[in-house]
């Protein structure tokens, strides 16, 4: 058999094969970069926004918009129609709205729709700190536009802060500032504690998160609305305040829910002592052991 490795044809053939292999490797690398893009460098990630992150911001904007629009619309309808909705009805509207938004947007953005929840998650390392400003801004914009929509839709009076017209869809203390602050702190603490339990703990039944959180909001509105307007959400209070220019007690609704949410998240993290599944905890529970031993 003739040796072709030393002649011109043999060398040219080897070069063609090597070039083809190189082109194929480069093509595969390009396809890999398309389907699995490499993470941006730190300095680039701060200047650019990915499409999935924009989708999350849009989800937070829409979620907060519909939350404030639906919940506050029930308040307006109740005020303008001789309390036809009633307090329990308003509480049900807020609770159901939260529930359906969690089920529809939770898989996209987490369905925070509340700056206090976003800040609380970030404080305990469950949410990227650098994404907090964008989330909060989206939520506040959604709340503000919802309040503006209601103002145009129902023709609400401009002079709502003077007390002459009792149709203000924002939040204001019914009693003293101390009562409102304390109530907002407690109900938001309770809400965030429940959120941490059903939405972040892998031992909980995640499918029931929306129902549990919505029910918590419903209960909180029932007990807190006559005292503090039951905000539990700085964005929900800030949006209407910006639209109406009415800032009475606004500091309460910015500070108390935020502190309450942070405290609720941290307290739950403190009592969350194990990562065992619920069935293992049940089997090894000291109470059940005692009962079984006593019964034998």
Swiss-Prot record:
GO cellular component, one term: plasma membrane
Alphabetized SUPFAM superfamilies for the sequence: Aquaporin-like (SSF81338)
InterPro entries: Aquaporin-like, Aquaporin_transptr, MIP, MIP_CS
Motif window: NPA 2: 233-235
Modified residues (N-acetylmethionine): 1
NCBIfam families (alphabetical): MIP
Protein known as: Aquaporin NIP1-1
Lineage per the UniProt record: Eukaryota, Viridiplantae, Streptophyta, Embryophyta, Tracheophyta
Name of the gene encoding the protein in the UniProt record: NIP1-1
């Amino acid at each position: 058999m003739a040796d072709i490795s030393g002649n011109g044809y043999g060398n040219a053939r080897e070069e063609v094969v090597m070039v083809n292999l190189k082109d194929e490797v480069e093509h595969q690398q390009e396809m890999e970069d398309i389907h699995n893009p490499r993470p941006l460098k730190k300095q680039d990630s701060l200047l650019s926004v990915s499409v999935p992150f924009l989708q999350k911001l849009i989800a937070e904007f829409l979620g907060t918009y519909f939350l404030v629009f639906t919940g506050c619309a029930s308040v307006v309808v109740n005020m303008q129609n001789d309390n036809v909705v009633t307090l329990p009805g308003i509480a049900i509207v807020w609770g159901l709205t939260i529930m359906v938004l969690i089920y529809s947007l939770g898989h996209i953005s987490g369905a925070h729709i509340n700056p206090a929840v976003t800040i609380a998650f970030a404080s305990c390392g469950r949410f990227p700190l650098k994404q907090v400003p964008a989330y909060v801004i989206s939520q506040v914009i959604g709340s503000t536009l919802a309040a503006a929509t209601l103002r145009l839709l129902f023709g609400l009076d401009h002079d709502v802060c003077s007390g002459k017209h009792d149709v203000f869809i924002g939040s204001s203390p019914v009693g003293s500032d101390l009562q409102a602050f304390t109530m907002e702190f407690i109900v938001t603490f309770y809400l965030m504690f429940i959120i941490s339990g059903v939405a972040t703990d892998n031992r909980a039944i995640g499918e029931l998160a929306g129902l549990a959180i919505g029910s918590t909001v419903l209960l909180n509105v029932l007990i807190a609305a006559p005292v503090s307007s039951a905000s539990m959400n700085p964005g929900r209070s800030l949006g209407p305040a910006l639209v109406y220019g009415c800032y009475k007690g606004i500091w309460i609704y910015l500070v108390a829910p935020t502190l309450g949410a942070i405290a609720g998240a941290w307290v739950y993290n403190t009592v969350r002592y194990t990562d065992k599944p619920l069935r293992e905890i049940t089997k090894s529970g000291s109470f059940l052991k005692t009962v079984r031993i006593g019964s034998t």
